[in-house]
Amino acid sequence: LGVSAKTQHNEVAPAQHELAPIYAQCNIATDNNQLMMEVMKKVAYRHGLVCLLHEKPFAGVNGSGKHNNWSITTDDGINMLDPGKTPHENFQFLLVLGAIMRAVDKHADLLRESASDVGNDHRLGANEAPPAIISMFLGEQLEDVVMQLIDKGDATSSIQKGKLKTGASTLPDLNKDATDRNRTSPFAFTGNKFEFRMVCLLYTSPSPRDAH
C-alpha cells in the first residue's frame, strides 16, 4: 500500500492496538489515514473479527482517538516550528509560536467543535484521554521564554536540556527532553511540532485543520 508505520503496539484496553503512520504532507497523510482505516476493517472481517473504529466502545476503559501532528515547513525545507538550541534568539520561531498561541486562544471553540461527536465526548476527560477543555502545553523551556517576553518584553536565556540520572552506576546519564512532554495535553508542543490530541477516531484527519 505504500504506507509506512512508525509504531505498532498494544494499548491499555483489551484488544486495543495503535498504528502510527510516519509523518507526511497533509494530503498524503490524509489519504494514508483513510486507507489504513478501510484496510483494517476489511482484514478484520476476513478473519471473522470486527475492527471497532469508535472513540468509546466500552465504558470504564480507555477509548481510542488520533493525534493530529501540526507542522509548518517552507518550500525549501525550513521547519518553522524548530526552536533550535536557543529559542529565545530564534525570532522566526517565536513569531510563528506566538501566532499559533493566539489562534488557539481565539478559536478554541472551533477546535473543540472539530473534535466533538457522541463517542468522543464520552472519551475525553478520563482514562488517559485529553481533557475536554482546550489548553496548550509548551514545556518548561518554551514556557520560560514566553514568560520572559510577557514579564520583561525581552527573552535573554533558554533553559537547556538536563541529564536524567537513573541512580544505577552501570547505566549512563540520559538527556532529558527540553519540551517536557505532557501526554494528556489537548494541544502540546513536542520538539518541533504541535500535537492536537482530541481528534475523533472516525473523523478524517484534516477536519481539525479545516476548522482552524
Per-segment meaning from a language model:
Residues V3-A5:
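Well-ordered beta-sheet/strand-loop patches within structured domains
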Residues L1, V12-A13, H17-E38, K42-H47, ...:
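Loop-rich catalytic cores of soluble enzymes, especially ATP-dependent carboxylate-amine ligases
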Residues Y203-H212:
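Single conserved hydrophobic/aromatic residue that forms the stacking wall/gate
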